[in-house]
C-alpha cells in the first residue's frame, strides 16, 4: 500500500481516505496550512489505485486493516480518520473496527454514500444518471458493470480532463461553481491521473465493494468513545444528502451537518474546518486555512 505523509511531523495524525476514483495525491490543505494546524496528514492509495497493489474481492471493511498496517508501520498509536465521498464508507469501517477501538479518536465523513442495501432509502433518489449508470444500479450483471468502469477508466487515464468534463455535464450549479476554480480542477485531474495510471482496478474494486455488504455494522460504532461527524451539501447529486441522513440515523450519537446551497465538491472547501474538529474541537478556524495547491507549495 502506497502512502504519503504531509504537514507537521509532530502533529496529531489524521488519515485522509480518498474518493472514487482517487489517490493519495487528492485535494488537501497545503503543507504549511497543515503545519500551522498541528496536523500530520496521512493519505494512502486504496488497493488497485496508484502505487498500491490490487486486492481482489476486497470489502469496505478491509480499509481498517490498511489503516492499521500504516499506523503500525509509522509507530502511530492514536489517530483520527476523515473520508470524503467514496472514502466515507471506509472511514466508518475504521470507526466500527474492534481492533482499532481505543486507537481511532474521532471520525469525520464528508459526502458519503450509504450502503447499497440500505433499508428504507431510495438509493438513487436525487442521484445523477452518470453515477446511477456507473454503479450499475438495477443491473445484476457484474461483468457489464466492470466493463463500463473499465471503459470510463481507460478514457480518463488517456486524458483525465475528459472525466471531469463528463462529470460537469451533470453537476449542480454549486459544483460547477466549485470546479470553476482552476487550482481545484488541476488537483482533481491530477488525482484522477495518479489513481488510474496503473489500470482501472482500484475504481472497479471500489464499486464492487459498494455493491456488496460493507462487512461491518454501523450500529457497532460507539460515538461516546469515537465521536462521528457527517457533513453533506444539500444539493449533492453524486452522493445525495439522503445518504448522509440515513447514515446519521444508523449511528447512535453521530452529528450531522447539512450545508444549504452546497454540493459534492464543496467538501474540499470544508476539509480544513473538519480537520480542526478532528484534532482540536474547541479551536477556532483560522483565516489562513487555504485549499488549492499541492502540499508544500
Q: At which residue positions do the language-model features occur?
A:
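Catalytic active-site module of serine/aspartate enzymes centered on a nucleophile-bearing elbow/loop
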Residues: 253-297
Amino acid at each position: 500500500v502506497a502512502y504519503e505523509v504531509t504537514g507537521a511531523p509532530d502533529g496529531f495524525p489524521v488519515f485522509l481516505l480518498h474518493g472514487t476514483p482517487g489517490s493519495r495525491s487528492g485535494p488537501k490543505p497545503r503543507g504549511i496550512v497543515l503545519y500551522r494546524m498541528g496536523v500530520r496528514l496521512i493519505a494512502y492509495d486504496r488497493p488497485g489505485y496508484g502505487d498500491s497493489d490490487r486486492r481482489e474481492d476486497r470489502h469496505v471493511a478491509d480499509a481498517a486493516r490498511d489503516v492499521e498496517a500504516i499506523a503500525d508501520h509509522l509507530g502511530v498509536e492514536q489517530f483520527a480518520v476523515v473520508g470524503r465521498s467514496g472514502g466515507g464508507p471506509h472511514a466508518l469501517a475504521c470507526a466500527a473496527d474492534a481492533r482499532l477501538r481505543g486507537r481511532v479518536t474521532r471520525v469525520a465523513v464528508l459526502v458519503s454514500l450509504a450502503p447499497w442495501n440500505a433499508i428504507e432509502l431510495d438509493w438513487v433518489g436525487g442521484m445523477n444518471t452518470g453515477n446511477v449508470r456507473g454503479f450499475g444500479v438495477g443491473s445484476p450483471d457484474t461483468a457489464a458493470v466492470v466493463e463500463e468502469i473499465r471503459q470510463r477508466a481507460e478514457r480518463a487515464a488517456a486524458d483525465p480532463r475528459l472525466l471531469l468534463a463528463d462529470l460537469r455535464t451533470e453537476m449542480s450549479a454549486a459544483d460547477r461553481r466549485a470546479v470553476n476554480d482552476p487550482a481545484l480542477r488541476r488537483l482533481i485531474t491530477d488525482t484522477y491521473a495518479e489513481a488510474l495510471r496503473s489500470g482501472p482496478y482500484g475504481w472497479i474494486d471500489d464499486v464492487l465493494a459498494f455493491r456488496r455488504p460493507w462487512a461491518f455494522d454501523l450500529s457497532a460504532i460507539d460515538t461516546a468513545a469515537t465521536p462521528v461527524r457527517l457533513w453533506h451539501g444539500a444539493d449533492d447529486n453524486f452522493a445525495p444528502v439522503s445518504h448522509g441522513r440515513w447514515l446519521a440515523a444508523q449511528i447512535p450519537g453521530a452529528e450531522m451537518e447539512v450545508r444549504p446551497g452546497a454540493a459534492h465538491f464543496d467538501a474540499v472547501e470544508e476539509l480544513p474546518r473538519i480537520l480542526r474538529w478532528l484534532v482540536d474541537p474547541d479551536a477556532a478556524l483560522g483565516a489562513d486555512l487555504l485549499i488549492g495547491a499541492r502540499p508544500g507549495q
